[in-house]
């Protein structure tokens, strides 16, 4: 018992959590000399590697001086905040990682508030101190002020600080120390993180905090043993959070070490293990001793704030590019996702339509991108926020938005956000000519803002937001100003007609792209929709003027990635997603029917 420490690593996106865990893994001797370690070895999913973000919390364990340290790497994005909250219940200590230049960011606040309310005393790791613009002292003061604002106790305010550069693999307790290795960090963990409370002699109590799925054994629950001990094939009782019970046997017990998962025979109080044997397992359920059942408090999960409709693709080009195109295939895949992804919900709406709700655009686009890579073909509607009724008042989710931008652009941003019903809370100058702006804004006002924001700040601004609370509905929010350019013919687009259309706005397609009636091929420069013919070719005549024929110059089209396309579309449009293409189209394809529907 005394030789176990359970810690979580929390930080803002891109402050180096996963890189730090890499360093801890390789320096604790968990990998043998021969093994080659990947970079950011904890981000196991392709999308995580590409975007450099962590989506699911991962766990691993290392040994240092006979002590087993269980480390859980948590996501930094607010969209995955539901994950973080559950992880905090499982650990006794937290490494709070802060970038030595950027300081405390809004999403860190969200997690820190939760950690402090659980009574955890964090260890503050100031990372990336090798940056030229690093100001570690200012950052430590910022953390202190944040803790005070969050109502931390005196004990929590007396936090240990470690300075590190995870990428170069060294840490030190004060800035004048020698830059050797991560040993100071290991020592701090052993010294300041309490060993798990609980006793091996009590009746068994364990709680599941995240789920995994295996094609052979079915659902796997990853759980912490709070009291007692458990062995393989033992009969136990599963107590669900709604009060129902199920008897069963533990068919597999799996322990973690480094990146490997190994089957084990026993687990004791303080361990974090994976178990199989129940199909009805859910997050927050307790596994207890059948002779003396004492369940643990179920966990509270945050409500989804946003929903989209996934539907079968019914466009004229449907079924040509995807492997899985039927409603049943889509339904099975979405339900399988819901088994392990706890912060999302899925309802069947009939006619091959499914309503999927989650914590934000990022979470939903990542699901869509995963489906697309698996060969699915489907359509998605525009994201909508979830409206709740509290005491007869319509309420919508509000977000806390923090923007770092060069000073020259702050005026334009404040004006834009004002139209989207944002309320400015603070404006502070930072070093290097940047300004930090803080707003409270309805989640609806944020849909579609990111692409405008990047244009307004010429790509130099950084924006982050996290969920605040539900508040009374704030009226209508300005949406996209420009209309769409819509194809009125079926066929292949020609360079000749695109050359004539491009004066009317920005195109989304290249010549030779297949188009159909009702497909959106560009953004109109005015606010109305315009039907155009992109497949006309040049008429041939006998007259020839030398050199005038080949003078077609096309502006390169605007490429639409999934997030941008979802933000761009309006109520009457849907996004068609196939493994090869993203196409935006009107819900009603026929132009005459569309005009009638508008009246």
Curated annotation (Swiss-Prot):
It is an enzyme of class 3 (hydrolase). Residues 2-197 form the tr-type G domain. It holds the Pfam family EFG_C. GO terms for molecular function: GTP binding; GTPase activity; ribosome binding; rRNA binding; tRNA binding. It catalyses: GTP + H2O = GDP + phosphate + H(+). This is Large ribosomal subunit assembly factor BipA. Keywords: Cytoplasm, GTP-binding, Hydrolase, Nucleotide-binding, Ribosome biogenesis, RNA-binding, rRNA-binding, tRNA-binding. One of its GO terms (cellular component) is ribonucleoprotein complex. Its EC number is 3.6.5.-. Monomer. One of its GO terms (biological process) is ribosomal large subunit assembly. A 50S ribosomal subunit assembly protein with GTPase activity, required for 50S subunit assembly at low temperatures, may also play a role in translation. Binds GTP and analogs. Binds the 70S ribosome between the 30S and 50S subunits, in a similar position as ribosome-bound EF-G; it contacts a number of ribosomal proteins, both rRNAs and the A-site tRNA. InterPro entries: BipA, BipA_C, BipA_GTP-bd_dom, BipA_II, BipA_III, BipA_V, EFG_III/V, EFG_V-like. Belongs to the TRAFAC class translation factor GTPase superfamily. Classic translation factor GTPase family. BipA subfamily. Its main location: cytoplasm. The keyword GTP-binding applies. It is found in: Cytoplasm. GTP binds at residues 14-19, 127-130.
């Amino acid at each position: 018992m005394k030789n176990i420490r359970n810690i979580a690593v929390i930080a803002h996106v891109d402050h180096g959590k996963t890189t730090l865990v890499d360093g801890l893994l390789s320096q604790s001797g968990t990998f043998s000399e021969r093994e080659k370690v990947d970079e950011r070895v904890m981000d196991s999913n392709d999308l995580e590697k590409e975007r450099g973000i962590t989506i699911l919390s991962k766990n691993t364990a290392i040994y240092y001086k006979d002590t087993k340290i269980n480390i859980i790497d948590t996501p930094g994005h607010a969209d995955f905040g539901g994950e973080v909250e559950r992880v905090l219940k499982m650990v006794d200590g937290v490494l709070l990682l802060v970038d030595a230049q950027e300081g405390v960011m809004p999403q860190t606040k969200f997690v820190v508030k939760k950690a402090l309310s659980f009574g955890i005393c964090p260890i503050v790791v100031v990372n990336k101190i090798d940056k030229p613009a690093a100001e570690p002292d200012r950052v430590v003061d910022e953390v202190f002020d944040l803790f005070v604002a969050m109502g931390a106790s005196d004990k929590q305010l007396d936090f240990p600080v470690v300075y590190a550069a995870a990428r170069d693999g060294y840490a030190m307790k004060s800035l004048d120390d020698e830059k050797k290795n991560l040993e100071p960090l290991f020592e701090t963990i052993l010294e300041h993180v309490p060993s798990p409370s609980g006793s091996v002699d009590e009746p068994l109590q364990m709680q599941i905090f995240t789920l995994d799925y295996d094609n052979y054994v079915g659902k796997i629950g990853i759980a912490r043993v709070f009291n007692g001990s458990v062995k393989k094939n033992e009969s136990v009782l599963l107590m669900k959070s709604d009060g129902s019970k199920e008897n069963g046997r533990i068919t597999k017990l799996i322990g973690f070490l480094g990146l490997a998962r190994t089957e084990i025979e026993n687990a004791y109080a303080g361990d974090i293990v994976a178990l199989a044997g129940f199909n009805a397992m859910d997050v927050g359920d307790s596994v207890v001793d059948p002779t003396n059942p004492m369940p643990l408090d179920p966990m509270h999960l945050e409500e989804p704030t946003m929903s989209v409709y996934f539907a079968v693709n019914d466009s004229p080009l449907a079924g040509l590019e995807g492997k899985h195109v039927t409603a049943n295939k889509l339904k099975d895949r979405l339900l399988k996702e819901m088994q392990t992804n706890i912060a999302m919900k899925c309802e069947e709406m009939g006619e091959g339509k499914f309503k999927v709700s989650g914590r934000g655009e990022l979470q939903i686009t990542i699901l869509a991108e995963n489906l697309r890579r698996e060969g699915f073909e489907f359509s998605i509607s525009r994201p909508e926020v979830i409206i709740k009724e509290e005491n007869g008042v319509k309420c919508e989710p509000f977000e806390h938005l923090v923007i770092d931008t060069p000073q020259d652009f702050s005026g334009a941003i404040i004006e834009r956000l004002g139209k989207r019903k944002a309320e400015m809370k603070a404006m502070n100058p930072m070093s290097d000519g940047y300004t930090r702006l803080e707003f409270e804004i309805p989640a609806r006002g944020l849909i579609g803002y990111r692409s405008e924001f990047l244009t307004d700040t010429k790509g130099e601004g950084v924006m982050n937001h996290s969920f605040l609370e539900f508040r009374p509905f704030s009226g209508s929010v300005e949406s996209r100003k420009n209309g769409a350019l819509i194809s009125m013919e079926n066929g292949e687009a020609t360079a000749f007609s695109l050359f004539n259309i491009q004066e009317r706005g920005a195109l989304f397609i290249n010549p030779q792209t297949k188009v159909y009636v009702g497909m959106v091929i560009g953004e109109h420069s005015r606010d109305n929709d315009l039907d155009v013919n992109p497949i006309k070719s040049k008429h041939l005549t006998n007259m020839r003027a030398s050199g005038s024929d080949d003078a077609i110059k096309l502006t390169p089209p605007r490429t639409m990635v999934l997030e941008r396309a979802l933000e761009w579309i309006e109520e009457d449009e849907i996004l068609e997603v196939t493994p090869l293409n993203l196409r935006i189209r009107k819900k009603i394809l026929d132009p005459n029917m569309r005009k009638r529907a508008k009246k």
